[in-house]
Amino acid sequence: MPFTLGQRWISDTESELGLGTVVAIDVRMITLLFPATGENRLYARNDSPITRVMFNPSDTITHHEGWQLKVEEVTQENGLITYIGTRLDTEETGVAMREVLLDSKLTFSKPQDRLFAGQIDRMDRFALRFRARKYQSEQFRLPWSGLRGIRASLIPHQLHIAYEVGQRHAPRVLLADEVGLGKTIEAGMIIHQQLLAGRAERVLIVVPESLQHQWLVEMLRRFNLRFSLFDDSRYSEALLDSSNPFDTEQMVICSLDFVRRNKQRLEQLADASWDLLVVDEAHHMAWSEEAPSREYQVIEQLAEHIPGVLLLTATPEQLGQQSHFARLRLLDPDRFHDYEEFVNEQQKYRPIADAVTLLLGGERLTDDKLNLLGELIDEQDIEPLLKAANSQSEDSEAARQELVTMLMDRHGTSRVLFRNTRNGVKGFPHRVLHQIKLPLPTQYQTAIKVSGIMGAKKTLDARAKDMLYPEQIYQEFEGENATWWNFDPRVEWLLNYLVANRGEKVLVICAQAATALQLEQVLREREAIRAAVFHEGLSLIERDRAAAYFASEEDGAQVLLCSEIGSEGRNFQFACQLVMFDLPFNPDLLEQRIGRLDRIGQNREIQIMVPYLEDTAQAILVRWYHEGLDAFEHTCPTGRTIYDSSYQELISYLATPSEQEGLDEFIHTCRQQHEGLKLQLEQGRDRLLEMHSNGGEHGQELAQSIAEQDNDINLVSFALNLFDIVGINQEDRSDNLIVLTPSDHMLVPDFPGLPPDGCTVTFDREQALSREDAQFVSWEHPIIRNGLDLILSGDTGSCAVSLLKNKALPVGTLLAELVYVVEAQAPKHLQLTRFLPPTPVRMLMDRNGTNLAAQVEFESFNRQLNAVNRHTSSKLVNAVQQEVHTMLQQAEALVEAQAQALIETAKREADDKLSTELARLEALKAVNPNIRDDEIEALEHNRKMVLENLNQAGWRLDAIRLVVVTHQ
């Protein structure tokens, strides 16, 4: 093409320079000035990587002064172009704009514009873009979004609760599962779903101070959710940036004490527009109608301002009726406003639970029970169901299940309360206690005697705690460097035990970090035993590394030495040997220690080793835990209650272990209390609530469906392809692990989700669970979601040119592969993607206007194509530009019918689903007062807005690839 001064060209290799203007021409070279950057470039007149910029009728172009022109006519004179059309700001017609006056900052966003401007991408990027569109659309349609990407085992009851609650508008529920059943994971899954769906954007978690780091770790490791921990120093720091420090972060964890002791903080928290509040250990907030505690009032004030509330608490039976009512009152003060009324109502529900027990037991129903069922379900004619349920026919079981479902809908608190018990959830291992009685060394005997004399002024509580840890008493008198481990028989026993069990992974827990560190040194120096240490002094990354070292089968540590606090929130169910080097001071901590191994999914018996020194507080505490509470071999829901009621007597025995008069009677009394409370708890079991919380078949189906999605081959190949194209380094490790690190040539300098020093990932859920340092990559992982956004929100792969070597077709045959996207724009919380995700419609057009996409599948077609360099691509495009315009017009006419069909299907599906949900809630409200009015109103508004936005859905061209046939 001949060059003329003033012509506008664009660089094929440096498109960021904007539009260039020809400012100098000689025999062999031309000079382009790029006004947007002020830079000049010198190019050869022949075969330079530059493309002439020419617009067509119907394009909109921008003048360098900022106004826009809708092009209607294009003229050329002396090699320079003039565009004639309508000026959009003044609507003046017949306006002429010479090309030299075009805005130099011009960028091409439409795929066809980029193609004609020579901004052509590699064909592998085009393929990646199409796959990204296809897979993203498929993932949006799956109903369990937010549940798949969790780094946790697929436990049916957890998935059921999370799915039920996570789908709701502003859920306000009580999660009251027994210890070890995963309330934290349930809450995390609900948070994850609400965030992914756009129902929540700002989340506040309030927990006891000792659990802050545990929650921080759990949210990050299991759900890839980065919360900010607010304490005094972080609060002061944030106060410099904002009048309300809590506005500086979207997701915050803080302690209840941090809020309680400062009125201004509470007001700022309440004003910070949170969407979801999560409160752990909610049963510790005391309440009575006359005098609610300060802690309770704090949460009450927050719950009044925040639409969604999750309270994690002990089981209602452990709480007692009044305390249980207090939690429900936080969730719905209008519904639960009077305690006496609540008690009367609960008594009315007792017969419902009894009826369910009968139905589930398959027993024949007496006339009294039949009448009761008739009264409980009074608005429908259920005679045929009752008759079938009481018959011996094949329909009996189905009729009983239907009656149970009807009763469940009418159950008092089933929508606001979820509670599973170990009795109702299968899959827990047996626990076997091994008591190892060891002699008390003379060094300790002397230290304990001296301590008794010198510590006479200490409180009973302090003396009891001292007596549990004789090595610390010894160090108090002999100095911190005293080598207690040289004579403590527990150390010798531990060494022998580990040597005898070389093939087993062993978790050793002790109260103090210093003890763990000293034991590691002894194991290493005396028997060369590889041990990892895990304590509160380590950073999160250091803890992950220690846990990964312990988990590794190859060259990993045999032993993990944990301090009490350091082990919070970590689970090691790949091990089954637990050594308690000392004992914790209360039953909750004991259960927490055993809970590191005693989880659902543990498939071996847990061997609990307790080496203790005779004639010490340790010996008394072992007896009290085992004989009084049965707390080693079974979970102990009564432990805290008995501990609180017998605390003074217990610590007096621990503080003076030599005085054991009455100890046997004390332990016997505690055992009787334990058995009595256990019986009460069992009799108070609400089978209907357990059924509702457990999820039954629904939970099983969810777990199975998600398991089938695990190890998705499409995900693995897509992810590796994505990492290659984005420029992320990949290094294969053993055990299905890949190390990802940033490179110097990435598409973006900082890839969101990829740490600066890289990370280890796996696509295998089981591997991720056994390796603390490996992230579990699913379609929901931030690296994949951010990768999809990076590709699809930009121009990557939006236009390409390829060659098809096929002797069956004439040379020069032209095909246009077009990818349209049918989509609706709407606020994220409406979740339009459930019904109409951005859906790719692929077309393969020939010169005759025929769409060959149905006959030619994408992947097989893509494998036959060859890449073309950018310069040759530009030449090919310029040669067939007019034909491509015609093919695009033909495709536009064809795509409309497909797009409209997709939109109509989405509208029908949305109307059916949302109308059914609404009708069900309205019907339930008639028989169950726990359906909130605002929930029904929100669903009604949601349905209306979804249908309105679907009516405005449209389609656009997302990507184009020209394919030219060659025989060479």
UniProtKB/Swiss-Prot annotation:
<dbReference type="InterPro" id="IPR022737">
    <property type="entry name" value="RapA_C"/>
</dbReference>
<feature type="binding site">
    <location>
        <begin position="177"/>
        <end position="184"/>
    </location>
    <ligand>
        <name>ATP</name>
    </ligand>
</feature>
<dbReference type="Pfam" id="PF12137">
    <property type="entry name" value="RapA_C"/>
</dbReference>
<dbReference type="InterPro" id="IPR023949">
    <property type="entry name" value="Helicase_RapA"/>
</dbReference>
<dbReference type="GO" id="GO:0003682">
    <property type="term" value="F:chromatin binding"/>
</dbReference>
<keyword id="KW-0067">ATP-binding</keyword>
<feature type="short sequence motif" description="DEAH box">
    <location>
        <begin position="280"/>
        <end position="283"/>
    </location>
</feature>
<dbReference type="InterPro" id="IPR000330">
    <property type="entry name" value="SNF2_N"/>
</dbReference>
<dbReference type="InterPro" id="IPR038718">
    <property type="entry name" value="SNF2-like_sf"/>
</dbReference>
<keyword id="KW-0378">Hydrolase</keyword>
<dbReference type="Pfam" id="PF00271">
    <property type="entry name" value="Helicase_C"/>
</dbReference>
<feature type="domain" description="Helicase ATP-binding">
    <location>
        <begin position="164"/>
        <end position="334"/>
    </location>
</feature>
<dbReference type="InterPro" id="IPR027417">
    <property type="entry name" value="P-loop_NTPase"/>
</dbReference>
<dbReference type="InterPro" id="IPR040765">
    <property type="entry name" value="Tudor_1_RapA"/>
</dbReference>
<dbReference type="GO" id="GO:0004386">
    <property type="term" value="F:helicase activity"/>
</dbReference>
<keyword id="KW-0010">Activator</keyword>
<dbReference type="GO" id="GO:0045944">
    <property type="term" value="P:positive regulation of transcription by RNA polymerase II"/>
</dbReference>
<feature type="domain" description="Helicase C-terminal">
    <location>
        <begin position="490"/>
        <end position="644"/>
    </location>
</feature>
<dbReference type="GO" id="GO:0005524">
    <property type="term" value="F:ATP binding"/>
</dbReference>
<comment type="function">
    <text>Transcription regulator that activates transcription by stimulating RNA polymerase (RNAP) recycling in case of stress conditions such as supercoiled DNA or high salt concentrations. Probably acts by releasing the RNAP, when it is trapped or immobilized on tightly supercoiled DNA. Does not activate transcription on linear DNA. Probably not involved in DNA repair.</text>
</comment>
<dbReference type="Pfam" id="PF18337">
    <property type="entry name" value="Tudor_RapA"/>
</dbReference>
<keyword id="KW-0238">DNA-binding</keyword>
<dbReference type="InterPro" id="IPR001650">
    <property type="entry name" value="Helicase_C-like"/>
</dbReference>
<keyword id="KW-0547">Nucleotide-binding</keyword>
<dbReference type="InterPro" id="IPR049730">
    <property type="entry name" value="SNF2/RAD54-like_C"/>
</dbReference>
<keyword id="KW-0347">Helicase</keyword>
<dbReference type="GO" id="GO:0140750">
    <property type="term" value="F:nucleosome array spacer activity"/>
</dbReference>
<protein>
    <recommendedName>
        <fullName>RNA polymerase-associated protein RapA</fullName>
        <ecNumber>3.6.4.-</ecNumber>
    </recommendedName>
</protein>
<dbReference type="InterPro" id="IPR014001">
    <property type="entry name" value="Helicase_ATP-bd"/>
</dbReference>
<dbReference type="GO" id="GO:0016817">
    <property type="term" value="F:hydrolase activity, acting on acid anhydrides"/>
</dbReference>
<dbReference type="Pfam" id="PF00176">
    <property type="entry name" value="SNF2-rel_dom"/>
</dbReference>
<comment type="similarity">
    <text>Belongs to the SNF2/RAD54 helicase family. RapA subfamily.</text>
</comment>
<keyword id="KW-0804">Transcription</keyword>
<dbReference type="GO" id="GO:0003677">
    <property type="term" value="F:DNA binding"/>
</dbReference>
<comment type="subunit">
    <text>Interacts with the RNAP. Has a higher affinity for the core RNAP than for the holoenzyme. Its ATPase activity is stimulated by binding to RNAP.</text>
</comment>
<keyword id="KW-0805">Transcription regulation</keyword>
<dbReference type="Pfam" id="PF18339">
    <property type="entry name" value="Tudor_1_RapA"/>
</dbReference>
<dbReference type="InterPro" id="IPR040766">
    <property type="entry name" value="Tudor_2_RapA"/>
</dbReference>
